[in-house]
């Protein structure tokens, strides 16, 4: 990369800032006829920058001067004299670093890719998903490395983020949600990519590649209920997805204002802080739930899976939020109870809900599902508000 500049041109470095062109010419003139002495100066201060270029008429003279003067002292400073290289050499020199730099990003990408890939691979199946999920999560974390930071903030729970990072592992393991929380988002991204895209972008980026929904879900599902859910999730998940996707849309549609506005408006805050995952999901799920409840069979398991997922979410969320944890749990619980009541009363879906969802989940699912609908807007919001104010 380094090309010699024109023959006879020498680079003189390490000069005393007091050394001027005349001094250089006097010193190097004894080796032969000098065509040009170029002392590099600072544009603003006009002071010597400590290096110069001396061009000899004869390349042989330049070689002699370089051989004799290199390392010699001039005006009290040892100078470096060598054949000048083209300026590109500088960029060239710098160039190599860039490759590393560029390489770095690729690495990052690779990491991301790996993460997604990992997730993706695993996502293919539940079991894998778990691993995948984990790996995913971890990959995510690793790929997300930077993200985590972002992630931390997003939760806006301050405390939670750290918790999340730590929990993410555990949480992940427990719910597989830690990583997944993001996933939930991923899902959101799925469902409401718009909403989350910002956030998701990071995670989703990973997630999406990951098939966030799937992997995550899978992860969730697999993790959450590895076996039962895995399969179920798997089968349903797609459905869920579909439903969810539609559900989301519907839920969004149902709660467009809410889904979007809340989510969007708060968008991410809420998503993060509140139930974005939970609420939104819940809502979405609810919507699904409802839509799903129509197909209870599917609905319940998925929803139920979903609810658990939600729960997971909540946990993850919680893990995520940490505060949210308590919050979500409390929230879910509170909500669940409140919501359940509200939702159920509002919805008058108690049976299906209860039936559809096991009680605990019920609370979650129903809460998530129930409330959102009836109380969804008001309830969930208030809940949200409450949750928020509470925390």
UniProtKB/Swiss-Prot annotation:
Annotated compartments: Nucleus
Swiss-Prot/TrEMBL keywords: Acetylation, Activator, Glycoprotein, Isopeptide bond, Methylation, mRNA processing, mRNA splicing, Nucleus, Phosphoprotein, Repressor, Ribonucleoprotein, RNA-binding, Spliceosome, Tumor suppressor, Ubl conjugation
Keyword Lipid metabolism found: no
Post-translational note: O-glycosylated. Arg-185 is dimethylated, probably to asymmetric dimethylarginine.
InterPro entries membership: Nucleotide-bd_a/b_plait_sf, RBD_domain_sf, RBM, RBM1CTR, RRM_dom, RRM_dom_euk
Top-level taxon of the source organism: Eukaryota
Keyword Nucleus part of the UniProt annotation: yes
GO molecular function: chromatin binding; identical protein binding; mRNA binding; protein domain specific binding; RNA binding; RNA polymerase II cis-regulatory region sequence-specific DNA binding
Listed Pro residues bias regions: 151-164
Record region (Necessary for the association to nascent RNAPII transcripts and nuclear localization): 186-236
N-acetylvaline modification, residue list: 2
Residues with the N6-acetyllysine modification: 30
Positions of crosslink type Glycyl lysine isopeptide (Lys-Gly) (interchain with G-Cter in SUMO2): 22, 80, 86
One GO cellular component term noted in the UniProt record for this chain: euchromatin
Region annotated Necessary for RNA-binding, chain positions: 333-391
One of the GO biological process terms: protein homooligomerization
Compositionally biased spans, kind Basic and acidic residues: 61-80, 194-215, 241-274, 338-347, 380-391
Record domain RRM: where: 8-86
Role this protein plays: RNA-binding protein that plays several role in the regulation of pre- and post-transcriptional processes. Implicated in tissue-specific regulation of gene transcription and alternative splicing of several pre-mRNAs. Binds to and stimulates transcription from the tumor suppressor TXNIP gene promoter; may thus be involved in tumor suppression. When associated with SAFB, binds to and stimulates transcription from the SREBF1 promoter. Associates with nascent mRNAs transcribed by RNA polymerase II. Component of the supraspliceosome complex that regulates pre-mRNA alternative splice site selection.
UniProt remark on domains: The RRM domain is necessary for RNA-binding, but not for splice site selection, indicating that its splicing activity does not require direct binding to RNA.
PANTHER family referenced in this protein's UniProt entry, alphabetically: TRANSFORMER-2 SEX-DETERMINING PROTEIN-RELATED
Subunit structure: Homomultimer. Found in the supraspliceosome complex. Identified in the spliceosome C complex. Forms a complex with ILF2, ILF3, YLPM1, KHDRBS1, NCOA5 and PPP1CA. Interacts with CLK2, KHDRBS2, KHDRBS3, SAFB/SAFB1, TRA2B and YTHDC1. Interacts with ERAP1; the interaction is RNA-independent. Interacts with PPIA/CYPA.
Protein name (database record): RNA-binding motif protein, X chromosome
